[in-house]
Amino acid sequence: MRRWQRARIGELWQLDASPHRWFPHSKLTFPMLNMLDDCSRLFTGSKLYERELLLSYFDFLPAAFLAHGRPLQLYVDYHSIFFTHDPDALTQLGWALQFYDISLRYAPTPQAKGKVEREHQFWQGRLPAYFASEKISEMAEANRHIDALRHHRNHKEVHRELRQTPQRAWNHAQKENRSVLRLAPRCPWWAYVWSVRTPLKVGTDGRVPIGTQRLRIEKPPGTKVVLCLHPSGHYSVLAAAPDPQELPALLFTNHPK
């Protein structure tokens, strides 16, 4: 095993965003989030977003954890979404990951994340021509094709350094008990942990600001509550922030049933 390659799947997943002009007839650049397992080179997630926002990661990461399990660490850069200069503080994303026992490891340079950087080049070299030939110009349709291409990359394309497909390397590690992956938990807080949370106080009118409206909450004026903005765009209001020792007390949601 090479020194710089993790021996077990789930030890370290490299995560990065790559802004690029993906659509050949558009001058706009969009970020693509990519994540791969350091041991097997399996793509655990690849998706385009309008912008690189906290909500983008709150959409991207739980989907990967549900599909593949929870790794021990994510290898990231010093973007403010991941890093705070206060050593005793966590970003909202860092806090969400810690809630599910996942830590962050910071790459000192872009070159230190060479594996995921090379995979950016793979997508940049392939997708614009593919989207042109398939006449794809909408992000939702593009992401459906990216899912299929990621599956093909994992299962069918032999990795030059591993001399086998990433999926075969992943399966081989599992067979040899070289895995530290944990299942995504059945947790009542799951949807709220992966949301942008804002502390609020109920106003003197018994209402709180939710989106462009002020809506009534069944709590006395002055009560502290937590507003959650979910990746889907809907809102929830909780009586308290996520706490593994408690159950969520949902005061409001506009999520369609």
Predicted regions and their residues:
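Charged alpha-helix within mobile-element recombinases
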Residues: 93-184, 231
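Short small-residue beta-strand/loop micro-motif enriched in glycine and branched aliphatics
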Residues: 41-46, 105
